[in-house]
Amino acid sequence: MALSVEEKAQIVTDYQQAVGDTGSPEVQVALLTANINKLQGHFKANGKDHHSRRGLIRMVNQRRKLLDYLKGKDLSRYSTLIGRLGLRR
């Protein structure tokens, strides 16, 4: 259920700050959000898959930590990212 190479490359090019940027918080949060959305679809069909649910919770927590970091570092980048991804925060 992981993202394909093409999907990852598309997300990286959409959210990168400069060419070759794969480690900025924006890129990491966008990749985690795509993985989370994909896993949510998996759980609609496989409700008893508790091992994958643990991984989902871990991804959600990692995304939350990265968003908190970005919010403390640069509020305008945080607000832009939240708007682009459609997150509730």
From Swiss-Prot:
Keywords annotated in UniProt: Ribonucleoprotein, Ribosomal protein, RNA-binding, rRNA-binding
Stored Pfam families: Ribosomal_S15
Record GO biological process: translation
PROSITE patterns in the cross-refs: RIBOSOMAL_S15
Record's keyword annotation contains RNA-binding: yes
GO MF annotation: an example: rRNA binding
Function: One of the primary rRNA binding proteins, it binds directly to 16S rRNA where it helps nucleate assembly of the platform of the 30S subunit by binding and bridging several RNA helices of the 16S rRNA. Forms an intersubunit bridge (bridge B4) with the 23S rRNA of the 50S subunit in the ribosome.
Oligomer and partners: Part of the 30S ribosomal subunit. Forms a bridge to the 50S subunit in the 70S ribosome, contacting the 23S rRNA.
PANTHER family named among the record's database cross-references: RIBOSOMAL PROTEIN S15, BACTERIAL AND ORGANELLAR (PTHR23321), SMALL RIBOSOMAL SUBUNIT PROTEIN US15M (PTHR23321:SF26)
Name under which the protein is recorded: Small ribosomal subunit protein uS15
Protein encoded by which gene: rpsO
